[in-house]
Amino acid sequence: VGTVGVPTSGVEWRIAKGGDDDMGGEFQIKGEMVFAGYYKNPEATAQSIVNGWLHTGDVVRLQDGQIKIVDRLKDIMITAGGKNLTPSEIENTMKASPYIKECVIVAEGRKFVGALVMIDYETVGKWAEARRIAFTHFRSLVETPEVRQLIDAEIASGNAKLAQVAQIRNFHMLTKELDHDDGEVTATMKVRRS
């Protein structure tokens, strides 16, 4: 579970270490199946293919002989203490909660992990209605103390599944839903990091 399988036979591959053995390294492949390069873009080709090795940009690690994709190399964050963190692992752990729809990690150059959290309005709304908690819209629901306590507990539960350095120590709940029209998410509803 959570792996992409084993490399195809006849393919040379390697995991290029980046300094943090727990995290893994960049998956690189070499062979006839590697494309010749980007059309009319020699600079991009030179960055992606070095000495015949295709640098995929995927950070992977071996798990029981299987390749597990950890994150994209460009998304890895380095804390002030020099620890490499994979945001997607932390974010997906938190989004396993039915009450958390989005979680965006903030850790680059910081002493600890912070997060922006967006509740799942439908699920949290039903939870609040069952407890007779009054609210009229997204923001009013987020701002109730009971919802803050609920999300505190969900973050604590998620943190228990993570290494100490990856645990969220501070978070802010968004008072509006992320919106494609505002440029906060892509057309496929993936959070824009920049």
Predicted regions and their residues:
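Conserved C-terminal "lid"/linker of ANL adenylate-forming enzymes
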Residues: M77, E102, E154-S194
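C-terminal boundary motif of the adenylate-forming
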Residues: K17, V59, S97-T123
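Conserved ATP-binding/catalytic segment of the ANL
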Residues: V11-A16, D21-T79, A96, A107
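Adenylate-forming
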Residues: V34-F35, I49, Q66-K95, V124-P145, ...
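Gly/Ser/Thr-rich phosphate-binding loop
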Residues: V1, E12, K101
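Flexible loop/turn segments at secondary-structure boundaries
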Residues: V1, D22, F35-G37, Q63, ...
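Conserved loop-to-beta-strand segment in the C-terminal subdomain of adenylate-forming
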Residues: M23, E108-I133, K161-T175
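Active-site loops of AMP-binding adenylate-forming
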Residues: V1-S9, N41-A44, Y121
